[in-house]
């Protein structure tokens, strides 16, 4: 079910629980600002979720409340994950669903990193 990108943060969401170690995940990267783990239902050969460690619901929330260090650290983490997974040369896609119209499903900011094959056009017309 889609969630609002402007809703208050719910610390019971699945990603908050992963951050606290209450739910297992196959982590492929972590640092002081972010963690990345394999998506449970991959849409491409490589499908990783990158999430900030802080309690942010959406890009709007993150860009308004996160420190400069958190923002920089998160962006750098996304790039580091792509490099670590060998996706820099062949290419990859980043996707962040924010809010109801975009069908955001978890009320914790996250970026999908897709790769491992040619992905084709992003949006069918």
What are these regions (language model features)?
Residues 1-125:
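HIT superfamily nucleotide-processing domains
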């Amino acid at each position: 079910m889609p969630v609002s990108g402007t809703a208050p943060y719910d610390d019971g969401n699945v990603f908050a629980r992963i951050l606290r170690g209450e739910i297992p995940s196959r982590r492929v990267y972590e640092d002081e600002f972010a963690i990345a783990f394999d998506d449970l239902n991959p849409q491409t050969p490589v499908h990783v979720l990158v999430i900030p460690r802080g309690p942010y619901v959406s890009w709007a929330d993150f860009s308004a409340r996160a420190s400069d260090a958190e923002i920089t650290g998160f962006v750098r983490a996304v790039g580091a994950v792509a490099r670590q997974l060998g996706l820099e040369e062949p290419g990859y896609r980043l996707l962040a669903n924010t809010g109801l119209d975009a069908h955001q499903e978890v009320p914790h900011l996250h970026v999908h990193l897709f790769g491992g094959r040619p992905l084709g056009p992003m949006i069918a017309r």
